Regions:
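Short, surface-exposed beta-strand/loop micro-motifs that present aromatic residues
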Residues: 147, 154-167
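Short, surface-exposed loop or secondary-structure junction motifs
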Residues: 1-146
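Peripheral terminal and inter-domain segments
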Residues: 135, 140-145, 151, 179-185
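Short, gly/Ser/Thr-rich active-site loops of penicillin-recognizing serine hydrolases
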Residues: 101-105, 114-115, 178-199
Length: 199
């Protein structure tokens, strides 16, 4: 109510099924990657306190309108800072436009310029607050220095180039194809880079 509604982001929400939304893409079929995470010592997340084969809480159906991330789904009821936000390209562009215009929406200062500057100031790892800002280490390869972006586990991404006043928002889904024989999902970075470079 403090961000999405005032920005006119009427198709952006957590838990869309509970909020009357019906149109959204499916993510994965169940939790195959997370099932692997708690079993496979190579991934480093083996949970020894329970036997994942005896736990019957795995989602074994195609996920539609549910956050894909297991921590957000099981522990945080679909609402978290790292996962679970459902949106559209049009709505996300409204958020990007506000960032590009130093916190302004039209003539109204929505978020202070100081806060926007804080969001988009590189730390020691060349990241802002919630934003990747190292163009040599992301799908925004060779972008101008002030560029910023964000990617999601399911394949989504936003790339913004303030000096050129443009953004690329991709709401793709790498999980619909299931896991590769290696046990991982497809890497969306090559197609992200190709689209970003083309734009």
């Amino acid at each position: 109510k403090n961000i999405f509604i005032p920005l006119g982001m009427h198709h952006t929400t957590y838990n869309p099924l509970a909020n009357g939304f019906k149109k959204f893409a499916a993510t994965s079929h169940g939790n195959p990657y997370e099932m692997r995470m708690v079993r496979d010592t190579l991934l480093g997340y083996v949970y020894k306190e329970i036997n994942p084969d005896q736990w019957n809480g795995w989602r074994m159906y195609t996920l539609r309108g549910e956050v894909n991330d297991g921590n957000a789904w099981y522990a945080l009821h679909g609402v978290s800072g790292h996962a679970g936000l459902f949106s559209t390209v049009d709505d996300l562009q409204k958020l990007v436009d506000m960032l590009l215009h130093e916190g302004k929406v039209g003539s109204k200062q929505f978020i202070s310029e100081k806060t926007i500057k804080l969001f988009l100031t590189k730390d020691d790892f060349k990241n802002g607050l919630g934003w990747m800002m190292d163009p040599d280490n992301s799908f925004m390869k060779n972008a101008p220095a002030e560029s910023f972006g964000h990617s999601g586990f399911s394949g989504t991404s936003i790339a913004v180039v303030p000096s050129l006043d443009f953004s690329v928002i991709l709401l793709i889904n790498r999980q619909n194809m299931g896991l590769l024989p290696t046990g991982y999902y497809y890497n969306p970075n090559p197609i992200r880079r190709q689209i970003f470079d083309a734009v």
